[in-house]
Amino acid sequence: LVMLGGIEAVWGLRQLYGYAVSNHSLYVLTGSFFNPGPYSGYLAMILPVCLHQWLTKRGEILCSDRNDGKGWKKVMDKVGAMVAGGVMLLILCVLPAGMSRSAWLAAGVSCLCVYAWHMDWTDKFRLLWQQQRQRVVMVVVGGFCVLLLAGYLLFVLKPDSARGRLFMWKITCRAIAEKPLTGYGIHNFAAAYGNAQETYFAAGDYEPWEERVAGSPEYAFNEYLQVAVELGIPLAVCLLVVVVLCLYRGVRKGRYGICGAILSLMIFSFSSYPLQLPVFIVTFGGLLVACLSGADRWQWLGLAVSVGIIGGFRLKNDLQVEQACREWMNARVLYSAGAYQSAEKEYGRLYPLLRDRASFLFEYGHGLHKQQQFGKSNRILKEALLRSCDPMILNVIGKNYQQMGDCLSAEDWFIRSTHRLPGRIYPYYLLAKLYAEPGFRQPDKFEKMKRMVLTKEPKVHSTAIRQMREEIKKIQLIFVHIKKDE
């Protein structure tokens, strides 16, 4: 882990200084990840391991006797301390640039705990409490005030981002309340979240800032809530108890670095999505096993062999999916260029391997919509709804029904889209056009949607919004002429 942390830290420094390219067009710093959030969380997880190694090796060096006949061991301890300390400094150089408040908090708390375990602060605190209780209370109260101030400053750093997380957790809790015992099933978070958010906004009892920060997330940005949504509260509590027991066992065995890494990941999981990435799952599993395993080399060898066998069985399927993703990227070029007929053949061929990916299903369904295969498009897009809460899926399904002449169904889907993300102007525009259809003309509803399109403040002004508003004004003129003729 220390070596991997060093590689990631150097990778990040090279990106910061322009010697390497990041994996995201919007961010300079991503390491080997796709955005700086998980990258910062990974570094924060490794930092307490480095601190533990540095403290341990440094202590062994200070306690060793120069003439104890173990000069080679002392040299290795020095090398280990230098490597751990060097990687720790590299991580500390890169971590602030990631701008991840969750990672900063995770790194700070976990490193403090590792240092406290090494210095045996528990016994010292107990003794101090017996001797100077009043002073301890003052220090604790002061520390609590400092934490509140730090929390406020972290909130002010990115206020809309913080509000967005809070709103996301609020909707997630509403989804949990619908199925608290059984959950919605693995990989069904997005569908559950989308329906819960749709129901919430449809009621109309919400604050303006909630409409502004609402989105269509793939993850809950809180692993505890996400597990509760997918597996139910009882199973989520059981899994948490297992992790806490492993952590307790690790502390009892003196494996402070490993326990610090687990604690860091647990804190980071409160406001991010690390366990949605395979690298975190594998590392987390290894850390938990390391807390329970003894010092016997045969146990570790057996563990390594078991992991290798499981990985071997997974490898074939993973390679097939990876190859399918590469071919999807090639097919996406055809899709983006408007060659929908050629793209459809590729998407149809890749469908069995990539049918669990929402973006793939949306592109496939949208391409079918462009080819006027409306029924087949709806079937694919309704599958995408089980994997995503993106309102654009609802919009395209509604347009399919409109093209098939089922205006009532189209209206229902467009209205669902306005409830799922009321801050978007596009579904109101689609409803306005629907109410202007000759066979479905409804002037009163058109006027209401027209006002929404023309007066609603978008998050970002764009050419598309200007064009929609101009078209609605033209449709309004047609309505005026029709009224005059009548």
Language model feature labels by segment:
Residues 355-356, 388-389, 422, 458:
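Short coil turns that delineate tetratricopeptide repeat
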